[in-house]
Amino acid sequence: KLLYNYYRIGGVNGDLNHEFMSRLGTWMSRAAKQIDSNLGLLNENELFVRRTRNLGTLDAATALRMGVTGPNLRASGVPFDLRRDRPYLVYPELEFDVPTRSEGDSLARYLVRIEEIKQSIRIIDQVLHEMPDGPVMAKLPRLVRPRPGRAFGAVEGPRGVYGVYAISDGTDQPFRMRIHDPSFVHLQL
């Protein structure tokens, strides 16, 4: 299991073994094929489509004004994805599409998320085949004292952009820290 405590400052808690990578590759091949066939039942279900079309419509201007990001923003017609538009880590080397719809309703948000699953499988497949051997953790001191200053970092997560703004006074604990979770913005709509 890869839980939240798997990721560490400087790397990850442990390396992925070849058995896991092989099983993941097999699972992804099956999942990619099943997504289209299984979702066809839901996508073509007249009742589902009728109940989600034109429901909870969010236009692009309102989404931008309210700070909406991620699939909710892309379902409103704004094709912004931090991984593509302000690339970080290995994303510049990966090929993926940014699913976007213009309707802004619940159906559009659902369809964007389904396409995001397909793109995630595509990204994972590329990374699995290109993952280099070597250490999975940087050699860092147990206690890190950053220089005094400010820093902001952001990543594209499944619900939108997650950001952390930190102010350091040079000690081992942040002087100030603000964590931005996209769900907080989305709950206000």
What spans do the regions from the language model cover?
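Active-site bordering "gate/hinge" segments
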Residues: 1-189
